[in-house]
Amino acid sequence: EAANIKACVESILAQDYPSAAFEIIVIDDFSEDDTAFIVQALSQQFPQVRLLQLKDHCKEGETLAYKKKAIEIAVSVAKGDWVLTTDADCIVPTRWLFLYNAYIQEHQPSFVAAPVMFIKTAGMLNQFQLLDFLALQGITAAAVGAGKHSMSNGANLGFEKAAFIAVGGYQGVDHIASGDDMFLMHKMKQTLHKPVGYLFHPDAIVLTAAMDTWKGFIMQRIRWASKARYYDDRSITVVLTLVYLFNLSFLLLALLGSWSTLIIALAFKTFFELFFLEPVAKFFKMKPELRFFACYQPIHIVYNIAAGLFGQLKTYSWKGRKVK
Protein backbone atom coordinates (compact mmCIF):
# COMPACT_ATOMS: atom_id res chain seq x y z
CA GLU A 1 0.00 0.00 0.00
CA ALA A 2 3.03 2.29 0.20
CA ALA A 3 2.50 3.43 -3.40
CA ASN A 4 -1.03 4.64 -2.61
CA ILE A 5 -1.26 5.67 1.04
CA LYS A 6 0.18 9.18 0.65
CA ALA A 7 -2.32 10.12 -2.06
CA CYS A 8 -5.14 8.61 0.00
CA VAL A 9 -4.32 10.56 3.15
CA GLU A 10 -3.70 13.75 1.19
CA SER A 11 -7.14 13.45 -0.44
CA ILE A 12 -8.69 13.39 3.04
CA LEU A 13 -6.55 16.30 4.20
CA ALA A 14 -7.79 18.29 1.19
CA GLN A 15 -11.42 18.18 2.35
CA ASP A 16 -13.69 21.18 2.02
CA TYR A 17 -14.33 20.81 5.75
CA PRO A 18 -12.81 22.32 8.92
CA SER A 19 -9.56 20.48 9.66
CA ALA A 20 -10.19 20.76 13.40
CA ALA A 21 -13.47 18.84 13.02
CA PHE A 22 -12.00 15.48 11.94
CA GLU A 23 -9.07 13.16 12.51
CA ILE A 24 -7.45 10.59 10.23
CA ILE A 25 -6.58 7.24 11.81
CA VAL A 26 -4.43 4.93 9.71
CA ILE A 27 -4.05 1.32 10.87
CA ASP A 28 -0.93 -0.40 9.59
CA ASP A 29 -1.82 -4.07 9.06
CA PHE A 30 1.59 -5.77 9.41
CA SER A 31 2.87 -4.05 6.27
CA GLU A 32 6.38 -4.86 5.13
CA ASP A 33 6.81 -1.80 2.92
CA ASP A 34 7.18 1.91 3.73
CA THR A 35 3.51 2.52 4.57
CA ALA A 36 4.11 3.21 8.27
CA PHE A 37 7.08 5.48 7.52
CA ILE A 38 5.04 7.54 5.03
CA VAL A 39 2.10 7.94 7.43
CA GLN A 40 4.42 8.80 10.32
CA ALA A 41 5.97 11.55 8.21
CA LEU A 42 2.52 12.92 7.37
CA SER A 43 1.50 12.85 11.04
CA GLN A 44 4.45 15.08 11.91
CA GLN A 45 3.26 17.63 9.38
CA PHE A 46 -0.48 17.31 10.02
CA PRO A 47 -1.53 16.80 13.67
CA GLN A 48 -4.91 15.28 12.74
CA VAL A 49 -3.16 12.25 11.18
CA ARG A 50 -2.57 9.33 13.57
CA LEU A 51 -0.76 6.05 12.91
CA LEU A 52 -1.68 2.89 14.80
CA GLN A 53 0.15 -0.40 14.38
CA LEU A 54 -1.95 -3.56 14.40
CA LYS A 55 1.10 -5.49 15.64
CA ASP A 56 0.83 -3.55 18.92
CA HIS A 57 -2.59 -5.07 19.54
CA CYS A 58 -2.40 -8.61 18.17
CA LYS A 59 0.09 -11.09 16.78
CA GLU A 60 0.14 -12.02 13.11
CA GLY A 61 -1.76 -15.28 12.69
CA GLU A 62 -3.83 -14.62 15.80
CA THR A 63 -6.93 -13.76 13.76
CA LEU A 64 -8.30 -14.21 10.26
CA ALA A 65 -10.19 -10.91 10.33
CA TYR A 66 -7.35 -8.40 10.41
CA LYS A 67 -9.40 -5.55 8.96
CA LYS A 68 -12.20 -6.05 11.47
CA LYS A 69 -9.64 -6.00 14.27
CA ALA A 70 -8.10 -2.82 12.86
CA ILE A 71 -11.48 -1.08 12.68
CA GLU A 72 -12.34 -2.09 16.25
CA ILE A 73 -9.05 -0.60 17.46
CA ALA A 74 -9.64 2.60 15.49
CA VAL A 75 -13.17 2.97 16.86
CA SER A 76 -11.91 2.50 20.41
CA VAL A 77 -9.59 5.51 20.12
CA ALA A 78 -11.65 7.68 17.75
CA LYS A 79 -12.70 11.00 19.26
CA GLY A 80 -15.69 11.74 17.04
CA ASP A 81 -19.27 10.49 17.12
CA TRP A 82 -19.03 9.09 13.59
CA VAL A 83 -16.47 6.91 11.82
CA LEU A 84 -15.97 6.88 8.04
CA THR A 85 -13.88 4.14 6.46
CA THR A 86 -11.90 3.89 3.27
CA ASP A 87 -8.95 1.84 2.01
CA ALA A 88 -5.32 2.78 1.46
CA ASP A 89 -5.64 2.50 -2.33
CA CYS A 90 -8.57 4.92 -2.49
CA ILE A 91 -8.97 8.60 -3.32
CA VAL A 92 -11.85 10.43 -1.63
CA PRO A 93 -13.52 13.52 -3.17
CA THR A 94 -13.07 16.97 -1.63
CA ARG A 95 -16.70 17.23 -0.45
CA TRP A 96 -16.71 13.75 1.09
CA LEU A 97 -16.95 14.81 4.74
CA PHE A 98 -19.28 17.71 3.99
CA LEU A 99 -21.77 15.46 2.19
CA TYR A 100 -21.65 12.78 4.88
CA ASN A 101 -22.24 15.38 7.57
CA ALA A 102 -25.19 16.86 5.68
CA TYR A 103 -26.73 13.40 5.15
CA ILE A 104 -26.25 12.41 8.79
CA GLN A 105 -27.79 15.65 10.08
CA GLU A 106 -30.82 15.25 7.83
CA HIS A 107 -31.52 11.51 8.22
CA GLN A 108 -30.03 10.58 11.63
CA PRO A 109 -28.95 7.08 10.49
CA SER A 110 -26.80 4.49 12.26
CA PHE A 111 -25.01 3.39 9.07
CA VAL A 112 -24.46 4.99 5.67
CA ALA A 113 -23.31 3.21 2.51
CA ALA A 114 -21.93 5.29 -0.34
CA PRO A 115 -20.72 4.93 -3.94
CA VAL A 116 -17.37 3.49 -5.00
CA MET A 117 -15.94 3.17 -8.50
CA PHE A 118 -12.77 1.84 -10.07
CA ILE A 119 -10.28 4.22 -11.62
CA LYS A 120 -10.56 3.93 -15.39
CA THR A 121 -7.43 2.73 -17.20
CA ALA A 122 -6.70 1.09 -20.54
CA GLY A 123 -7.24 -2.60 -21.20
CA MET A 124 -9.86 -5.31 -21.37
CA LEU A 125 -9.54 -6.34 -17.71
CA ASN A 126 -10.19 -2.83 -16.43
CA GLN A 127 -13.10 -2.39 -18.80
CA PHE A 128 -14.67 -5.65 -17.64
CA GLN A 129 -14.23 -4.72 -13.97
CA LEU A 130 -15.81 -1.30 -14.54
CA LEU A 131 -18.93 -2.90 -16.03
CA ASP A 132 -19.10 -5.59 -13.37
CA PHE A 133 -18.68 -3.05 -10.58
CA LEU A 134 -21.30 -0.75 -12.11
CA ALA A 135 -23.81 -3.56 -11.66
CA LEU A 136 -22.74 -4.17 -8.05
CA GLN A 137 -22.97 -0.48 -7.22
CA GLY A 138 -26.39 -0.23 -8.81
CA ILE A 139 -27.64 -3.22 -6.84
CA THR A 140 -26.19 -1.77 -3.63
CA ALA A 141 -27.99 1.56 -4.03
CA ALA A 142 -31.24 -0.07 -5.16
CA ALA A 143 -31.22 -2.59 -2.30
CA VAL A 144 -30.65 0.06 0.37
CA GLY A 145 -33.33 2.22 -1.22
CA ALA A 146 -35.75 -0.72 -1.08
CA GLY A 147 -34.95 -1.35 2.58
CA LYS A 148 -33.11 -4.63 1.96
CA HIS A 149 -29.64 -3.43 3.03
CA SER A 150 -27.86 -6.39 1.48
CA MET A 151 -24.62 -4.78 0.28
CA SER A 152 -22.07 -2.08 1.11
CA ASN A 153 -18.40 -1.42 0.45
CA GLY A 154 -15.78 -0.65 3.10
CA ALA A 155 -14.01 1.73 0.71
CA ASN A 156 -16.80 4.23 1.36
CA LEU A 157 -19.10 3.90 4.34
CA GLY A 158 -19.83 5.52 7.66
CA PHE A 159 -21.33 4.45 10.97
CA GLU A 160 -22.19 5.98 14.29
CA LYS A 161 -19.61 5.11 16.95
CA ALA A 162 -22.33 4.56 19.57
CA ALA A 163 -24.16 2.21 17.19
CA PHE A 164 -20.97 0.21 16.60
CA ILE A 165 -20.55 -0.23 20.35
CA ALA A 166 -24.25 -1.03 20.83
CA VAL A 167 -24.14 -3.99 18.42
CA GLY A 168 -20.89 -5.29 19.91
CA GLY A 169 -18.74 -4.34 16.94
CA TYR A 170 -17.82 -7.47 15.01
CA GLN A 171 -18.58 -9.87 17.83
CA GLY A 172 -20.09 -13.00 16.31
CA VAL A 173 -18.54 -12.45 12.88
CA ASP A 174 -14.94 -11.83 13.92
CA HIS A 175 -13.93 -15.33 12.81
CA ILE A 176 -14.80 -14.51 9.18
CA ALA A 177 -11.92 -13.04 7.17
CA SER A 178 -13.96 -10.61 5.07
CA GLY A 179 -17.23 -8.76 5.51
CA ASP A 180 -16.20 -5.82 7.68
CA ASP A 181 -18.70 -3.75 5.69
CA MET A 182 -21.73 -5.94 5.04
CA PHE A 183 -21.86 -7.83 8.34
CA LEU A 184 -21.74 -4.57 10.28
CA MET A 185 -24.49 -3.16 8.08
CA HIS A 186 -26.63 -6.24 8.69
CA LYS A 187 -26.07 -6.15 12.47
CA MET A 188 -27.08 -2.51 12.73
CA LYS A 189 -30.17 -2.99 10.57
CA GLN A 190 -31.31 -6.04 12.54
CA THR A 191 -30.46 -4.75 16.02
CA LEU A 192 -31.04 -1.00 16.09
CA HIS A 193 -34.09 1.15 15.48
CA LYS A 194 -32.28 3.75 13.41
CA PRO A 195 -32.22 3.92 9.61
CA VAL A 196 -29.51 2.55 7.35
CA GLY A 197 -29.05 4.88 4.41
CA TYR A 198 -27.24 5.46 1.14
CA LEU A 199 -25.40 8.69 0.27
CA PHE A 200 -26.49 9.01 -3.35
CA HIS A 201 -24.43 11.93 -4.61
CA PRO A 202 -21.87 12.03 -7.46
CA ASP A 203 -19.53 14.18 -5.36
CA ALA A 204 -19.37 11.39 -2.76
CA ILE A 205 -17.90 8.77 -5.12
CA VAL A 206 -14.67 7.25 -3.79
CA LEU A 207 -12.26 6.03 -6.45
CA THR A 208 -10.19 2.90 -6.00
CA ALA A 209 -7.78 0.86 -8.09
CA ALA A 210 -9.09 -2.18 -9.94
CA MET A 211 -7.19 -5.46 -9.95
CA ASP A 212 -4.34 -5.45 -12.47
CA THR A 213 -4.38 -9.22 -13.17
CA TRP A 214 -7.15 -11.71 -13.91
CA LYS A 215 -5.89 -13.88 -11.05
CA GLY A 216 -6.16 -10.97 -8.63
CA PHE A 217 -9.65 -10.18 -9.89
CA ILE A 218 -10.86 -13.76 -9.45
CA MET A 219 -9.34 -13.99 -5.95
CA GLN A 220 -11.05 -10.74 -4.99
CA ARG A 221 -14.42 -12.02 -6.18
CA ILE A 222 -13.93 -15.39 -4.46
CA ARG A 223 -13.19 -13.45 -1.28
CA TRP A 224 -16.41 -11.48 -1.68
CA ALA A 225 -18.43 -14.61 -2.45
CA SER A 226 -17.02 -16.44 0.59
CA LYS A 227 -19.17 -14.29 2.89
CA ALA A 228 -22.45 -15.62 1.52
CA ARG A 229 -22.56 -18.75 3.68
CA TYR A 230 -22.58 -16.63 6.85
CA TYR A 231 -25.55 -14.38 6.06
CA ASP A 232 -28.34 -14.53 8.65
CA ASP A 233 -30.90 -12.92 6.38
CA ARG A 234 -32.52 -15.77 4.44
CA SER A 235 -33.89 -13.40 1.81
CA ILE A 236 -30.32 -12.47 0.78
CA THR A 237 -29.35 -16.14 0.59
CA VAL A 238 -32.42 -16.93 -1.53
CA VAL A 239 -31.70 -14.09 -3.96
CA LEU A 240 -28.03 -15.06 -4.29
CA THR A 241 -29.01 -18.69 -4.92
CA LEU A 242 -31.52 -17.70 -7.60
CA VAL A 243 -28.94 -15.47 -9.31
CA TYR A 244 -26.41 -18.30 -9.22
CA LEU A 245 -28.89 -20.79 -10.71
CA PHE A 246 -29.86 -18.23 -13.35
CA ASN A 247 -26.24 -17.91 -14.46
CA LEU A 248 -25.78 -21.67 -14.28
CA SER A 249 -28.72 -22.16 -16.65
CA PHE A 250 -26.77 -20.39 -19.43
CA LEU A 251 -23.85 -22.76 -18.99
CA LEU A 252 -26.21 -25.74 -19.10
CA LEU A 253 -27.80 -24.46 -22.32
CA ALA A 254 -24.34 -24.20 -23.88
CA LEU A 255 -23.37 -27.71 -22.74
CA LEU A 256 -26.63 -29.11 -24.13
CA GLY A 257 -26.04 -27.37 -27.45
CA SER A 258 -29.30 -25.40 -27.27
CA TRP A 259 -27.78 -22.49 -29.13
CA SER A 260 -30.95 -20.78 -30.35
CA THR A 261 -32.45 -20.80 -26.84
CA LEU A 262 -29.12 -19.61 -25.41
CA ILE A 263 -28.89 -16.68 -27.83
CA ILE A 264 -32.48 -15.59 -27.14
CA ALA A 265 -31.93 -15.87 -23.37
CA LEU A 266 -28.69 -13.88 -23.59
CA ALA A 267 -30.45 -11.19 -25.61
CA PHE A 268 -33.19 -10.83 -22.98
CA LYS A 269 -30.62 -10.85 -20.15
CA THR A 270 -28.54 -8.17 -21.86
CA PHE A 271 -31.57 -5.98 -22.62
CA PHE A 272 -32.93 -5.96 -19.06
CA GLU A 273 -29.51 -5.51 -17.48
CA LEU A 274 -28.73 -2.58 -19.77
CA PHE A 275 -32.09 -1.06 -18.84
CA PHE A 276 -31.05 -1.28 -15.17
CA LEU A 277 -27.47 -0.11 -15.76
CA GLU A 278 -28.22 2.94 -17.90
CA PRO A 279 -29.05 5.30 -14.98
CA VAL A 280 -26.22 3.80 -12.92
CA ALA A 281 -23.72 4.46 -15.70
CA LYS A 282 -25.10 7.99 -16.05
CA PHE A 283 -24.55 8.61 -12.33
CA PHE A 284 -20.93 7.41 -12.55
CA LYS A 285 -20.39 9.18 -15.91
CA MET A 286 -19.61 5.88 -17.62
CA LYS A 287 -22.36 5.55 -20.22
CA PRO A 288 -19.81 5.06 -23.06
CA GLU A 289 -18.63 1.87 -21.36
CA LEU A 290 -22.05 0.26 -21.85
CA ARG A 291 -21.42 -0.25 -25.56
CA PHE A 292 -19.08 -3.12 -24.62
CA PHE A 293 -21.51 -4.72 -22.17
CA ALA A 294 -22.92 -7.42 -24.46
CA CYS A 295 -19.41 -8.55 -25.47
CA TYR A 296 -18.53 -9.42 -21.88
CA GLN A 297 -21.69 -11.40 -21.06
CA PRO A 298 -20.10 -14.87 -21.54
CA ILE A 299 -17.11 -13.96 -19.33
CA HIS A 300 -19.43 -12.45 -16.71
CA ILE A 301 -21.58 -15.58 -16.54
CA VAL A 302 -18.63 -17.98 -16.25
CA TYR A 303 -16.83 -15.90 -13.61
CA ASN A 304 -20.00 -15.60 -11.50
CA ILE A 305 -20.41 -19.37 -11.54
CA ALA A 306 -16.74 -19.96 -10.68
CA ALA A 307 -16.54 -17.31 -7.95
CA GLY A 308 -19.76 -18.52 -6.34
CA LEU A 309 -18.56 -22.12 -6.29
CA PHE A 310 -14.99 -21.52 -5.14
CA GLY A 311 -16.14 -18.92 -2.63
CA GLN A 312 -17.81 -21.72 -0.70
CA LEU A 313 -15.21 -24.44 -1.25
CA LYS A 314 -11.76 -23.04 -1.95
CA THR A 315 -8.98 -21.52 0.11
CA TYR A 316 -8.05 -18.20 -1.47
CA SER A 317 -5.08 -15.86 -1.28
CA TRP A 318 -5.49 -12.20 -0.38
CA LYS A 319 -2.67 -9.72 0.20
CA GLY A 320 -0.16 -12.49 0.77
CA ARG A 321 -2.34 -14.47 3.19
CA LYS A 322 -4.00 -17.83 2.69
CA VAL A 323 -7.61 -17.68 3.84
CA LYS A 324 -10.20 -20.44 4.07
Q: Where are the language model's segments positioned?
A:
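Glycine-rich, basic loop-to-helix element that forms the pyrophosphate-binding segment
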Residues: 56-78, 99
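Short glycine- and hydrophobic/aromatic-rich loop-to-beta-strand nucleating segment
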Residues: 149-159, 163, 182
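Membrane-embedded multi-pass helical conduit in multi-pass membrane proteins
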Residues: 236-315
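Catalytic donor/gating beta->alpha subdomain of glycosyltransferases that bind UDP-sugars
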Residues: 104-137, 162-165, 171-236
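Short aromatic/hydrophobic "clamp" motif used to bind/position activated sugar donors
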Residues: 83
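Acidic donor-binding segment of Leloir-type glycosyltransferases
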Residues: 9-60
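Acidic donor-binding/catalytic loop of UDP-sugar-dependent glycosyltransferases
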Residues: 33-34, 88-103
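Acidic metal-phosphate-binding loop of nucleotide-sugar-dependent transferases
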Residues: 32, 90-91, 157, 182
